Amino acid sequence: MLRRLLERPCTLALLVGSQLAVMMYLSLGGFRSLSALFGRDPGPTFDYSHPHDVYSNLSHLPGAPGAAGAPLAQVLPDCPERSPFLVGPVSVSFSPVPSLAEIVERNPRVESGGRYRPAGCEPRSRTAIIVPHRAREHHLRLLLYHLHPFLQRQQLAYGIYVIHQAGNGTFNRAKLLNVGVREALRDEEWDCLFLHDVDLLPENDHNLYVCDPRGPRHVAVAMNKFGYSLPYPQYFGGVSALTPDQYLKMNGFPNEYWGWGGEDDDIATRVRLAGMKISRPPTSVGHYKMVKHRGDKGNEENPHRFDLLVRTQNSWTQDGMNSLTYRLLARELGPLYTNITADIGTDPRGPRAPSGPRYPPGSSQAFRQEMLQRRPPARPGPLPTANHTAPHGSH
């Protein structure tokens, strides 16, 4: 029966036509659609072997020295959704480390406090870049040199905040980010909060520093440290973006993670428990290079992280922005960034070994999966709003 069908001319013509149609579909981008259905969309193709200089096209921006000035009209048009000044992959070099004076000279339109606003059009996003920091001056200069032109080409209104932890106690990245969010929101009603590690430099300016109104974005999806792929599906470290409402809906970040490790997985769990989902740019776009460095004194591996992660689903509504206390020591408007120096206290547990369950080396990924699959508790009551004030005697 099948043989007789295949011998008919009309059947053969139908099979050949179907094959040609499939080939045509794939050649016109259908493969990308199938990838989106059955896996992560790899996104557009970029040639990272021939990157552009990170300062490319900066002189072409309206209002730049030598460029056409901004129109005199009182009402400016909206900036395009995708800036015409983008170049794609940009070169990232770790040496020589530029001086602050050199960075200022190359970014003449950046204003006091690290603020920038495009000329000639109304920006579609006001983005605050918040960088936790301590004893990484070379890394900070590399980031500032790289990030300012990167963001200007995207035609965003932005400000860079560097949150400096005072003292020599154990580093607390997540708590510093909470401090940065609160201080940034006191300055302006930002549309988007970009939480940015100091040692990560973006490699593609099509990776737009804007938020997704549908949910938190994890932006550093392809780091050279991990072979330009995600280390595990729920990873939320490096660079992330949230609207102020999203940040407050999940009660910000935890304050109790002193030292290296654990807070990223706590944050990913908070996103889910708050009823939100993580989105990401295509892998081909979210490329980052990490500045090489040795382990930091005061940022040793956190021995308590697994015990804290066990409690996340019960503690996230009590530990975060609504429990944040710190002492503001300085607020300085530098030419390239706003410096916030804060005393955030010290680890109340000290360096002693944790109590409770212990987990063998190599079990962290299985542990993450277990934590992220637990059912959320009942929805909490209202969390603090962006204009929430700190307890008396603290910020």
Swiss-Prot record:
EC number(s) given by UniProt: 2.4.1.-, 2.4.1.38, 2.4.1.90, 2.4.1.275
Region described as Disordered: spans on this chain: 341-395
Disulfide bond annotation, renumbered to this chain: 79-121, 192-211
This protein's pathway: Protein modification; protein glycosylation
Annotated Gene Ontology cellular component terms: cytosol; Golgi apparatus; Golgi cisterna membrane
Pfam families named among the record's database cross-references: Glyco_transf_7C, Glyco_transf_7N
Catalytic activity: an N-acetyl-beta-D-glucosaminyl derivative + UDP-alpha-D-galactose = a beta-D-galactosyl-(1->4)-N-acetyl-beta-D-glucosaminyl derivative + UDP + H(+); N-acetyl-D-glucosamine + UDP-alpha-D-galactose = beta-D-galactosyl-(1->4)-N-acetyl-D-glucosamine + UDP + H(+); a beta-D-GlcNAc-(1->3)-beta-D-Gal-(1->4)-beta-D-Glc-(1<->1)-Cer(d18:1(4E)) + UDP-alpha-D-galactose = a neolactoside nLc4Cer(d18:1(4E)) + UDP + H(+); a beta-D-glucosylceramide + UDP-alpha-D-galactose = a beta-D-galactosyl-(1->4)-beta-D-glucosyl-(1<->1)-ceramide + UDP + H(+)
Cytoplasmic-side segments: 1-10
Cofactor(s) this protein cannot do without: Mn(2+)
Gene3D superfamilies: Spore Coat Polysaccharide Biosynthesis Protein SpsA, Chain A
Membrane topology note: Single-pass type II membrane protein
Binding positions (N-acetyl-D-glucosamine): 262-265, 305
Cell compartments where the protein resides: Golgi apparatus, Golgi stack membrane
Keyword Disulfide bond: yes
UniProt keyword Glycosyltransferase present: yes
Gene Ontology MF terms in the entry: beta-N-acetylglucosaminylglycopeptide beta-1,4-galactosyltransferase activity; galactosyltransferase activity; metal ion binding; N-acetyllactosamine synthase activity
CDD domains: b4GalT
Top EC class for this record: transferase
SUPFAM superfamilies in the cross-refs: Nucleotide-diphospho-sugar transferases
Ranges facing Lumenal side: 32-395
The protein, known as: Beta-1,4-galactosyltransferase 3
